[in-house]
Design a protein with these regions (language model features):
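Non-catalytic, mobile gating and regulatory segments of ester bond hydrolases
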Residues: 1-228
C-alpha cells in the first residue's frame, strides 16, 4: 500500500515504509512479538529517517507503533516528529483489554479477518498465502496484546487521527487520542467504511493526509515514515 502512496502523494512527501521483521522483504527473519522490542528495533534501524523534517504515520498496529516511536524519541532526547498521524486505532490509554482474547488459533483468526474485511477472497483459497497471513496476524496480535500504556505522558506534537465510522473500535476510544498530545494541533477525521477504510477510500484518506501535513510540517523534503 505504501509503495503505491509514493506515486499518489505530492513529490514534497517522501514515503519511507518501515518494514517489520517476518514480512515482505524481511520474510526470512523471525517475528518480533514484544512491543517495546519492536519500537527499539525500528528506532535503531531507521535512525536516519527519524531526523529533521519528518512525520510519522501508522494504521492499526502501525498507529500504536508510530506513537511508541514518538514516545521513545522523546524519552531519549531525540528530535520529535513534526506531526503524528494515526489511523484505525484506539488511543493507547483506552485500548480494549478483551480485543485479542481467544485469538490464539487459526479458526479464530480467520473469523476475525472476515469480520474486519479488506482481505481478498483469493487469499483464503490459497493454503500457502493463508498460512503466511495467519502467522503474521498472530504475531501482530501478540504485539498488541502485550502492549501496556504505563501512564506515558502526552507528547508535544501535533496529532491527527483518521478513523472509520463502521470500525468495531468504539468512538470514545478513538476520541481519547486527544489526551495524547499537549499541542493545539489535534484533529479527528472520520471516513465511511470499517477497519480498512484506508483502502476503501484511499483517495479521501490521502487528501486528508496532505491537508493535515502542511499544518505541522514545512519544507520541500518531508519524510513520512509509515507502518501498516
Amino acid at each position: 500500500m505504501y509503495l503505491r502512496w509514493r506515486r499518489l502523494l505530492p513529490r514534497w512527501i517522501e514515503v519511507v515504509p518501515l518494514e517489520l521483521p517476518g514480512r515482505g522483504s524481511r520474510l526470512g527473519e523471525d517475528f518480533v512479538e514484544d512491543f517495546d522490542a519492536m519500537v527499539s528495533l525500528l528506532c535503531g534501524e531507521h535512525e536516519v529517517a527519524l531526523r529533521g523534517n519528518f512525520a510519522l504515520f501508522g494504521h492499526s498496529m502501525g498507529a500504536l507503533l508510530a506513537w511508541g516511536i514518538a514516545q521513545r524519541l522523546c524519552a531519549t532526547g531525540r528530535p520529535l516528529p513534526r506531526a503524528l498521524l494515526v489511523s484505525g486505532s484506539a488511543a493507547p490509554s483506552q485500548r480494549d483489554p478483551d480485543r485479542f482474547v481467544d485469538m490464539d488459533d487459526d479458526e479464530a483468526l480467520i473469523a476475525d479477518m472476515r469480520k474486519q474485511g479488506g482481505t481478498p477472497e483469493e487469499l483464503f483459497a490459497s493454503p500457502e498465502l493463508l498460512r503466511m497471513t495467519l502467522d503474521t496476524l498472530a504475531a501482530d496480535y501478540r504485539v498488541c496484546e502485550g502492549f501496556a500504556h504505563r501512564g506515558a505522558a502526552p507528547l508535544s506534537v501535533p496529532l491527527h487521527v483518521f478513523a472509520g465510522r463502521e470500525d468495531d473500535i468504539q468512538p470514545w476510544r478513538v476520541e481519547a487520542w486527544s489526551a495524547e498530545t499537549l499541542d493545539a494541533g489535534f484533529s479527528l477525521d472520520w471516513f465511511e467504511g470499517g477497519h480498512f477504510f484506508i483502502r476503501q477510500h484511499e483517495a479521501q484518506v490521502l487528501a486528508a493526509l496532505v491537508r493535515r501535513l502542511p499544518q505541522s510540517v514545512a519544507g520541500e523534503a518531508d519524510v513520512l515514515p509509515a507502518i501498516a
